[in-house]
Amino acid sequence: MLLVGSGAKFVQQLEQAGALAIYVTPEGGSEGHYLRRLRGAGYEVVTLSSKGIGDLASYLTRIHGVRPATLGKSERRTYFFPALIEQYRATLPPKAKGLVFWFYEGHVFSQQELSYLVKLSREDKGVKFVVELGRERSIRWQPLQSA
């Protein structure tokens, strides 16, 4: 059985760093413990897949277009969605500490995209990022700028 700590150190380091790189176990399940700890600390957590996002800056901070797959003879359309950060910030409860975006499959991000997440977390103190960068035998994390 995997022995998991209280998660208080994880929340504290996320608040200090703003963005964390996390390495989870291959069998999974342990990250749910840390998600619950973040929610218990007053954060609203949004889990997203890193694959298929496209331009990360547009996706998080600007109105961006999304084109669904064309199936045969249907016409090509573009739908426009608001910035993801503003969309979730509008629905935050009044007592929430902020938003945490948890990206799984984060190994597909380039180094430039990871540094953008660090920069964005420093500019906007109400937004934090956790990126799953790989697998290890036991769960560990470190600040994203040193990953």
Swiss-Prot record:
Reaction catalysed by this enzyme: a plastoquinone + NADH + (n+1) H(+)(in) = a plastoquinol + NAD(+) + n H(+)(out); a plastoquinone + NADPH + (n+1) H(+)(in) = a plastoquinol + NADP(+) + n H(+)(out)
Gene Ontology MF terms: oxidoreductase activity, acting on NAD(P)H, quinone or similar compound as acceptor; quinone binding
Span of the signal peptide: none
Membrane topology, from the record: Peripheral membrane protein
One Gene Ontology cellular component annotation held by this UniProt entry: plasma membrane-derived thylakoid membrane
InterPro entries: NAD(P)H-quinone_OxRdtase_su_N
Compartment(s) where it occurs, according to its Swiss-Prot or TrEMBL record: Cellular thylakoid membrane
EC number of this enzyme: 7.1.1.-
Any single Pfam family the record assigns to this protein: NdhN
Predominant cellular place of this UniProt entry's protein: membrane
UniProt keywords, alphabetically: Membrane, NAD, NADP, Plastoquinone, Quinone, Thylakoid, Translocase, Transport
Keyword Membrane: yes
PANTHER family: NAD(P)H-QUINONE OXIDOREDUCTASE SUBUNIT N, CHLOROPLASTIC (PTHR35515:SF1)
Function: NDH-1 shuttles electrons from an unknown electron donor, via FMN and iron-sulfur (Fe-S) centers, to quinones in the respiratory and/or the photosynthetic chain. The immediate electron acceptor for the enzyme in this species is believed to be plastoquinone. Couples the redox reaction to proton translocation, and thus conserves the redox energy in a proton gradient. Cyanobacterial NDH-1 also plays a role in inorganic carbon-concentration.
Protein family per UniProt: Belongs to the complex I NdhN subunit family.
Quaternary assembly: NDH-1 can be composed of about 15 different subunits; different subcomplexes with different compositions have been identified which probably have different functions.
Name of the featured protein: NAD(P)H-quinone oxidoreductase subunit N
Organism the protein comes from: Synechococcus sp. (strain JA-2-3B'a(2-13))
